[in-house]
A protein has these predicted regions:
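Bacterial N-terminal signal peptides
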Residues: 6-19
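Extracytoplasmic small-molecule ligand-binding "clamshell" domains
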Residues: 24-98, 230
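Bilobed "Venus flytrap"/periplasmic-binding protein-like clamshell domains
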Residues: 34-54, 116-156, 168, 185
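Short amphipathic alpha-helical coupling segments at ligand-binding clamshell hinges
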Residues: 40-44, 222-233, 242, 246
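Short helices/loops that flank or line small-molecule/ion binding pockets
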Residues: 65-85, 154, 166-186
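Acidic, polar ligand-binding/catalytic clefts
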Residues: 67-135
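Periplasmic-binding protein-like
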Residues: 109-115, 119-122, 192, 196-231, ...
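Ligand-binding clefts/hinges and TM-proximal coupling segments of bilobed small-molecule sensing domains
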Residues: 143-154, 234-287
Length: 287
């Protein structure tokens, strides 16, 4: 009898809790791109969201990397269709037409300062080149989906492409091209992660390119609430100095190295910048 009574209680209890309205859990904010070289971008977004707390209980606060390995173009498509919430990429007119940028440069122009990953035995050859020789004698490697590809070509450089970022390192070793331009904040870190796979590669010591290239957070055009929240948070982090502190923490090595180096900096035009784009403020790390 007791067993039957207990069973009735279990059934009734299950029915009672099933009948209760489900409590909606805040959805996560999915971001792209993902990987070690992008860590700073997402720490900055985390900082911005902390400076602009959610106004409602169901507003997303938790950041989650997009799980699938997709190309940059695919990532932008997913943002436009609701599969991804935030991306962090450089700007151009096409992107600004399709997505909603938060127009605060999150990398302060440092991505536009490009040094070259090269085969180590080419150090002396490239060091002896002037600007004209760089254009005439070198072939550069870039991802076919990166926004800096048309910048390089518009400035007279010969470029070999691949849709795979990782394949570009192997192509450089195989002499498919001569130099892989990488952001000042990217080159050393990327080679450090691949020193066992590609010990024959090095960062070139004497040359650099610079073009204005702001990097923004982007959201779906309809997601104005998230855009406003990110902008509010970034503005607050700029005001209290925490934005700059985070930037300098992540880029301290590169900033110190640049201060000591005597590189020939070749300034390039950026024809893909939308009209009215504010030039990056580089004084945190350069001049």
């Amino acid at each position: 009898m007791l067993n039957r009574f207990a069973a009735v209680l279990v059934v009734c209890g299950a029915w009672f809790f099933a009948a209760l309205p489900a409590v909606a859990q805040p959805q996560a904010i999915q971001y792209f791109p993902v990987g070690p070289i992008y860590e700073y971008r997402w720490k900055l977004l985390e900082l911005a969201l902390a400076h602009a707390p959610a106004k409602t209980a169901d507003e997303p606060t938790r950041l989650v990397p997009y799980a699938d390995d997709v190309t940059q173009n695919r990532g932008m498509h997913l943002l436009q269709t609701g599969g991804i919430d935030v991306i962090a990429l450089g700007t151009n007119a096409e992107r600004e037409a399709k997505m909603l940028p938060i127009k605060i440069d999150i990398l302060r122009g440092i991505v536009g300062f490009r040094v070259f990953v090269i085969r180590a035995f080419d150090q002396a050859r490239i060091a002896g080149m002037d600007e004209q020789a760089l254009r005439k004698e070198l072939t550069f490697g870039l991802n076919s989906q990166w926004a800096d590809l048309p910048i390089m070509r518009a400035n007279g450089f010969t470029v070999e492409t691949s849709s795979s970022y990782e394949n570009l390192f192997g192509m450089l070793v195989a002499k498919r091209f001569d130099a892989f331009p990488r952001g000042l904040n990217e080159a050393g870190r990327e080679l450090g992660e691949r020193r066992l796979a590609y010990p024959q590669l090095a960062v070139e010591r004497t040359k650099a390119l610079y073009f204005p290239y702001p990097v923004y957070f982007w959201v779906n055009k309809d997601n104005t609430a998230l855009a406003q929240r990110i902008e509010r948070g970034l503005t607050a982090a700029l005001a209290d100095g925490s934005f700059r502190k985070l930037f300098e923490t992540y880029h301290a090595t590169e900033i110190a190295l640049l201060a000591k180096e005597k590189r020939q900096v070749i300034r390039l035009k950026n024809p893909i910048l939308p009209a009215g784009t504010v030039a990056p403020d580089t004084h945190w790390w350069w001049r």
